[in-house]
Amino acid sequence: MKITRRQALLGLAGASSVGGLGAHELLDWTATDGPLSDAGMNGLLTVADIVHPAAPEDAERTISAYVGRLNDRRVRGLVTTLSELDSRSRRHYGASFGALSRAQGERLLARIGANRVQSRPEGTLAERVRYHLVNSVLYALLTRPAGTEPLGIGNPVGFPGGFASYTGEL
């Protein structure tokens, strides 16, 4: 069977439109349903409050949308790490990690050593906290549509207008 150019172009156009719809789903910043429970989301919001004190009002929606786009392996790692951190929190403070204050959460993360280790997905609890929780929350918050503008670095050096905005010459 021979395919004509027209049939090939129609097939290519159909495949591209399906691929484009899939890419649109992956980049949907408004998705709010996610695989985490309320306790899990509270844990991630506590991490957000610790590592990014100027977290925006839409932090919960942004983090939920980010977690909803993760693959199953990453979500399992995130949930397992949150569960272990939660049990550690209950042992030290008698409350879940999501219920801790910012100061208590900081102390707990420092106690397990999350502020002194490299991130590894399969390492110690501190390395996994750094990889699955801290890095994921920072990535979600800093790559949202508003980006880094709330931090005063909206146009980094190397991008058009970057040097002028970086040096305050605008």
Give residue ranges: language-model regions.
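Short, exposed beta-strand "edge-strand" segments with a Pro/Gly-rich flavor and a Y/T-containing core
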Residues: 1-2, 33-35, 93-100
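C-terminal segment of N-terminal export signals and the immediately downstream linker at the start
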Residues: 3-7, 12, 16-55
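Residue-level signal for well-ordered alpha-helical segments
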Residues: 28, 40, 55-58, 62, ...
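Mature-region segments of soluble proteins
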Residues: 46, 61-170
